[in-house]
Amino acid sequence: MKKLSTYIFPILLLVVSCKEEEKKPKVIYEDAKAVVAPIQKDTTQIKIADLPIHIEGTSFLVHPMGEYSLTDGSSKSNSGASSAYDKDESFKVSNYNDYEITGYISNFKFQKIGSDSLRLLTEKPILIETVTYLKTVSDKTKQQILVYTLADMDTNKDGKINSNDIKTIYLSDISGNKFTKIGTDFQELIDWNLIEATSHLYFRTLEDINKNGAFDKTDKVHYHFINLQNKDWKVEEYSPIN
């Protein structure tokens, strides 16, 4: 009996701790209309930027910006690497490959080649995870367009914008101008895809129908597309399953 209780007690502790660590909702609803909560400033972080990226075929340099965390008297990057100075990891904000920039990026600055001036993408607090240059659209329509997946609202009301908030989708031109949200507030971006033959950008979002703060199979999937040959970037909704 003594041996049995020795095994049961840790299991009970594990069950209790798992219940305490239940996944927090991505959305906390207050009123019918969106409330913009103040973002808490983290005084342990300093702003840094990667060296500029030149996307082939464009006349702009892109400067990814992020944050470098200083904790417990030592330096820590967003990736979790800890050291006094680690040139390979600690100061790296983003990665670039095949016309796509990835990372946890707080903003961008754009610089036209031949100019010394840098232009900020947005004044809003955001967290960008991916930026994709639509090269085939540029080749076909002469429009140089970037697609962003990012969080732009503190939807779970924890005082910060991070990967625990709802992800949405934006577009801009290669200079950072026309930075436009094409997703809907409080709808989680599922995925997006470019049909090169028609220059149509398709994307899906999930609406929290039951307002339980979580996104699951009981909620509604919305289907959208944009004809990128049109410069107004008008979003159309369609129903492939009806």
Language-model features: where?
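Conserved beta-propeller blade repeats
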Residues: 127-147, 186-202, 238-242
